[in-house]
Swiss-Prot record:
Topological domain spans for side Lumenal: 98-494
Transmembrane segments: 77-97
Listed name of the protein: Protein SSH4
Species classification: Eukaryota, Fungi, Dikarya, Ascomycota, Pezizomycotina
Alphabetical list of InterPro entries matching this protein: B30.2/SPRY, B30.2/SPRY_sf, ConA-like_dom_sf, SPRY_dom, SPRY_Ssh4-like, Ubq-SigPath_Reg
Gene3D superfamilies for this protein: 2.60.120.920
PROSITE patterns named in the record: B302_SPRY
Record topology, Cytoplasmic segments: 1-76
Organism in which the protein naturally occurs: Coccidioides immitis (strain RS) (Valley fever fungus)
Predominant cellular place of this UniProt entry's protein: membrane
Gene Ontology biological process terms in this record: protein transport
Annotated GO CC locations: endosome membrane; vacuolar membrane
Length: 494
């Protein structure tokens, strides 16, 4: 029989030395078989004593071997699943990019929404819309389509130039005004921002685009007069744009219509957006250049954003209508109805310019440069004595009339003097008339002009009485300062 110590020693040795050979295993079974038979009836009443340290080490060794094997199996399974998942993802992307290209609507290269990438889908929608249009609408649409093909959006240079920037610095928000298209001539602009539309479809753009320096820019349009049959469209467009169409109907344009719909590059189907606006309402348009977001307001209440990501375009405020109406636009020259825009000063530019305008006429007394030019301009001009008296056979200087100074240019009416009797050809008075003419010419040569006396000498450099102006500057005089230096000196004196 084996004692407990022999059993522990044998198990420890087998674990350390590894798995024994088949012959060794059979001998072990024979040795332990008798032990199990001998101890079998005794185990019914046996209570195990406290586990020793060596037994704990054996149990830990057995658990560690089992855990390492499980971890290895788990790692292998996860690796296989990960590789399979990556392969499935790659195959899905290849299938999606290769076999579904024609059925997708993709944003353009800058991620801007509303651009039609699927030409077939757009052509299908266009064909369905043209069937429901009348002949006039079809003609207008085809005309606009031809205009856009000949003048693609953003094909013109619309950045603010240096001269426009200086005009904004000088005039402030007053630099913005609406310029109607002369070829259309279906609207009239008064006082720069008051637009009156007539009986056909027409749009009008501002002369300058919305700047991009500040965080938000905002402007408002008040509906002063609007019949129920007229449709008004207020929004933003780029140049060139077909102004015989309303904003929002074609690419790179967006608008809020009086029917409560919005249009964003959509000539066919409008989208319901907000409440309708009628006479007396105020519609505002806001633009965030940093995020390219456009939003609208109605009577001071902000509506949801319409578009995002429109950063690269230069947008022009645009108002259009298809019937008689009157719209007044506020670019910031007055207070806004939208309180947030009023407080944060979201106008297109300051109300007053920061650059002083040119000085008015007659205010050059304090300018050294202009005063010097005035002095030089007072130099009298002299002519030769040969030109002081002229004679022409067609001028009758000896005839009667009021005596005037050569410098008198008054427009007072002259007294009526009966002219001498005309002497016609083939009359008996022809010879007498010739003699009278010779006598008059002789008298003219003997008499000097009235109130005229030639000066004793004609100075070469010009002289007026006792005053004499030297046109040659004195080398001892200080140099004439430049314009900038003169302006700076004048400001310091003030």
């Amino acid at each position: 029989m084996f004692s407990r110590d022999d059993l522990v020693t044998t198990l420890t040795t087998s674990l350390i030395q590894g798995t024994p050979a088949p012959s060794s295993q059979s001998s072990i079974h024979r040795r332990f078989g008798s032990f199990q038979q001998a101890t079998e009836p005794v185990n019914h009443g046996y209570r195990p004593s406290r586990v020793s340290a060596s037994e704990k080490s054996i149990m830990f060794s057995l658990g560690g071997n089992v855990g390492s094997t499980g971890k290895g199996i788990l790692i292998g399974i996860l690796s296989a699943l990960g590789s399979a998942g990556i392969a499935i993802i790659v195959l899905s992307l290849v299938f999606f990019l290769r076999y579904t290209h024609r059925g997708r609507i993709i944003l353009d290269r800058l991620g801007r929404p509303g651009e039609y990438d699927d030409e077939q889908a757009f052509a299908r929608e266009e064909a369905e819309a043209l069937e429901s249009m009348d002949e006039l609408q079809q003609a207008e649409y085809m005309r606009a389509k031809a205009f856009i093909q000949a003048n693609p959006p953003e094909s013109a240079q619309t950045d603010i130039s240096l001269s426009q920037f200086l005009a904004i610095q000088e005039k402030g928000v007053s630099a913005w005004e609406f310029e109607p298209e002369l070829e259309i001539a279906n609207c009239f602009v008064e006082a720069r921002t008051e637009i009156e539309f007539f009986d056909s479809e027409c749009s009008v753009q501002s002369n300058l685009p919305v700047p991009k320096q500040n965080e938000v820019y905002y402007w408002e349009a008040k509906i002063y007069d609007k019949p129920e049959t007229s449709l008004i469209s207020i929004g933003m467009t780029t140049k060139p744009y077909p102004l015989f169409r309303l904003p929002g109907f074609h690419k790179t344009s967006i608008s809020y219509q009086s029917t409560g719909h919005r249009r964003h590059n959509q000539p066919f189907t409008p989208t319901l957006y907000g409440p309708e606006f009628v006479q007396g309402d105020v519609v505002g348009v806001g633009y965030r250049p940093r995020s390219g977001t456009i939003f609208f307001t109605r009577n001071g209440k902000k509506l949801e954003d319409v578009a995002h990501g429109l950063k690269s375009q230069n947008f022009f405020p645009t108002v259009g209508a298809n019937g008689p109406c009157t719209v007044h636009v506020n670019f910031g020259q007055l207070g806004f109805v939208f309180i947030e825009a009023n407080v944060k000063k979201w106008g297109l530019a300051p109300m007053t310019g920061s650059l002083a305008p040119p000085p008015p006429y007659g205010s050059e007394q304090g300018s050294i440069l202009l005063e010097t030019g005035r002095e030089n301009s007072q130099t009298p001009q002299w002519w030769g004595s040969a030109h002081s008296r002229t004679r022409s056979g067609t001028i009758r200087l000896g005839q009667g009339g009021p005596v005037r100074s050569p410098t008198d240019i008054s427009l007072a009416p002259l007294p009526h003097i009966s002219p001498p009797h005309d002497v016609g050809e083939g009359t008996s008075n022809s010879a007498q008339a010739g003699e009278n003419d010779s006598d008059v010419d002789a008298a003219i040569l003997d008499q000097p002009p009235p109130e005229y006396s030639s000066p004793a000498t004609s100075p070469p450099n010009g002289q007026s009485g006792d005053a004499r102006i030297d046109i040659h500057p004195d080398p001892n005089d200080p140099p004439i300062p430049s314009y900038d230096a003169a302006v700076l000196q004048q400001q310091q004196q003030v």
